[in-house]
Amino acid sequence: MSRYRGPRVRIIRRLGALPGLTNKTPQLKSSSINQSTSNKKISQYRIRLEEKQKLRFHYGITERQLLNYVRIARKAKGSTGEVLLQLLEMRLDNIIFRLGMSPTIPGARQLVNHRHILVNGYIVDIPSYRCKPQDFITIKNQRKSETIISKNIEFYQKYKIPNHLIYNSLEKKGLVNQILDHESIGLKINELLVVEYYSRQA
């Protein structure tokens, strides 16, 4: 299954706020939601499916990619759900988004694909590149690159940068300080339901 390229507002109306997908907020009538949910019993499968979809759309990844991340998380030490979120949060496109260099993860992916981003001084054009502690994220020394990202940072610096990241505005340099903790996740999600959804596949 490929990445979703349709209307983003339609997705957040169904799943709720997904800041990685869009900075717009869903406008829903609470009364209509309550009526629709009370009139029909929501199955456990649907609940797990929607949590899985939240992860997919927020991080902008394909079904196959998410399944692969779940499989990697299952083999790692520690809680599968927490490891899964750490893997997704340490993607380069997400790190750029969380640093405020891009308003959304799709926007961050474009910056990476167009070779605007350096990791430890080297151009990296793979959005799924897995960052690690002490990685430095910088902008390619070209006017176009600096102009694009400086505008984003100026606008989005009102949002708090999570504790596992540091951004130096003078040097225009980001640092992955550590592996993030659960409180730093930028999404309201029950990752255990996602793991349960994939229990027969992973």
From Swiss-Prot:
GO terms for molecular function: rRNA binding; structural constituent of ribosome. It is found in: Plastid, Chloroplast. Signal peptide: none annotated. One of its GO terms (biological process) is translation. The keyword Ribonucleoprotein applies. Residues 90-153 form the S4 RNA-binding domain. InterPro entries: Ribosomal_uS4 (IPR022801), Ribosomal_uS4_bac-type (IPR005709), Ribosomal_uS4_CS (IPR018079), Ribosomal_uS4_N (IPR001912), S4_RNA-bd (IPR002942), S4_RNA-bd_sf (IPR036986). Its main location: plastid. Keywords: Chloroplast, Plastid, Ribonucleoprotein, Ribosomal protein, RNA-binding, rRNA-binding. GO terms for cellular component: chloroplast; small ribosomal subunit. Belongs to the universal ribosomal protein uS4 family. One of the primary rRNA binding proteins, it binds directly to 16S rRNA where it nucleates assembly of the body of the 30S subunit. NCBIfam families: PRK05327.1, rpsD_bact. Part of the 30S ribosomal subunit. Contacts protein S5. The interaction surface between S4 and S5 is involved in control of translational fidelity. This is Small ribosomal subunit protein uS4c. It comes from Catharomnion ciliatum (Moss). The gene is rps4.
